[in-house]
Amino acid sequence: MRAAPPDLPGSQTTDSPLDRALALLLAGEREAALRWSAATVDRDPQTASALILTSRLLADAGRSEAATEGFELGMKRAIDAGNLPIAVAAVGDLRALGVDVQKHLDTIAAAFCKSSPRLSDPAMLPPPPLPDPGHDFQPLSSFLSGPLLLSKATQIIHEARQKYEALAGHDRALIAPVALFSQIERAGVRALIGAFDMITVPAGAVVIAEGEEGAEAYIVARGELEVRRAQRDAEPASRATLETAGALPEGAEPGSLTDLTLARLTNGALFGEMALLSRAPRAASVVACRPSILLVARRDALEAVAVARPEVGVELAAHCRRRMVANLVRTSPVLIAVAPEERPALVERFETRTFEKGDKLIAVGEDTSGLHLIASGEVAVVGEDGGESFVISTLGPGDVVGEVALVLRRKANADVIAVHPTVTLELPREHFLSLIQEHPAILLSLYSLAVQRDEETSSVLANSTTSLADDYVLV
């Protein structure tokens, strides 16, 4: 059974000629890679990623002039296609050749910034073309090698530039806004894109590993990756249910650890940025399905940008909060009781809270400050027996904390402590009453959860000298 989202119409399900070129490059087969990438440009001179790969191979072979021509053209084609990451990648290659890239960075920033006249409502833009199946695609002849191959690739780049220049009198295409970048004005975008470097990864490469601490954010310039989370499959009795739902991969045994595919990331996707807001371990892995070109920025580089351009830091924090809210809207058991269209406005009542490792969200014997939805990180519910503390349960993103004391109107009977740096959205106690009055379904959901958790917790505390079940939860 499939444990991944279904393939979408028009999605890439087989290696493209450019995939082949990237794979050959990563394997060190540079001439073979050039035959495939240059042939891709010859077939479709609008393909920015092929222009950039061909130019990179020319640069490696010492053809700097042709490479510069190709990188500059690739940047322009990428902008016209609305692919900011590929445009930035091209500028990175130009910088490596010693080219002054200031005007190129300004061009990208002007195209994608908040006030750009080229930005348009995505609904008004024509749909992107379907991927070329490439059934009749042929790379350049294997008889071409050495200087002859380089000259042919140079000619293809030059002809591609001539075709672009022939369109000089036409209006440039409108493009869709890009998350985060198109919420910032030109100078801020200029500073932000300068923080990113380009990397190329092969199929199967683990870009982010679940459980590791992260300090980087990534953008997919070209390629496809999967977000995967390790999970322990259900008990044998649940096999049929899991297989029917497609949640148990074929050949996996219930009770074993398997990877559940949560999402696919394609061109333009920004991921890993939550590590910039929280130093919690990564909640999932990200693995390349195809050879991919990525942009990467480290936390310290982005923090330097935020210091120099405070508006960038403000928007980056707002972007991360929007992402947290969007995730909680989809996954929080509290919000599921509310109609989907009402959830975003409801979450806006919550305040963002950050906790360092060891901080207490809730203290035993005290009133809770409010209801917490865990956005990132991890907390431990801690009880005490004979003067010794023990962990009753751990809770992570999507879980709710504090509902027992609020709903049952009593003091907390356990500590809740941040295991890692943690970010929550908190609904203050004084706003809780108005929330449940407006949305009684939330009260019903929380009451059921609170009673269940309270009963389980009482059982654990009463028998704390015996082994503790991992799924007992107290909040």
Predicted regions mapped to residue ranges:
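Cytosolic regulatory regions built on CNB/CRP/Popeye-like sensor folds
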Residues: 2-23, 27, 31, 38, ...
